[in-house]
Amino acid sequence: MAVPSAQLRRDARVERRRLRIVEAALALFAGHGYTVTSVDDIVTRARVSKSAFYEFFESKEHCFRELLAEEGGALIHDVLTSAATGHDHHERLRLGITRFVVSCFERSDVARLLIVESVGLSDDVEALRHELQARFADAVAEEVRHAMTHDAFYEDKDPAVFGRAVVGAVSDAVGYFLTHPGVDADSLAASLCVIFAP
């Protein structure tokens, strides 16, 4: 049975309203920080009522978690998808690191949420951040695990530690150079690849 056109129009309006709220929240959380941003700031920027905000989110933190899950999840998905196209472990590691760095520079607002604003915010947000980072770290660890038997560089590396080290170093370097200009994404990615995927 077909959905009535009036219902489709209503659903489209609701989705546009949610999108305006999410876009406003992302810009404010990234630009001003989570702590300084209020629900009033978000609804003012999105040009919606407070009740519209609460139609979608229980709280400012719930909005932040949803945004981090959607946007951070999409970024990590892109990283893993790009890495999977590599022909060997070196290429997969390089592609993953490069995609993460370039994506963070292209979407610095999302990078700020994932790397800066989510740290220590709450137990739930921290758990989500760790879950997103773990997807990247686990993929790196898996590459190292397979490379240990035939690549001298990786033979003495603990895969889990190496995976976390890559995520930590790459995230920290991106966070630093997003706020201290002077290095472009490609140069930073190349330098990190020399360290972790020589």
For the regions a language model picked out, list residue spans one by one.
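Short secondary-structure transition hinges
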Residues: 95, 102, 106-141, 152-153, ...
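Hydrophobic alpha-helical connector segments
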Residues: 66, 80-109, 162-166, 186-189
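Generic hydrophobic, amphipathic alpha-helix propensity
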Residues: 13-25, 42, 67-75, 79, ...
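N-terminal intrinsically disordered/low-complexity leader segments
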Residues: 1-16
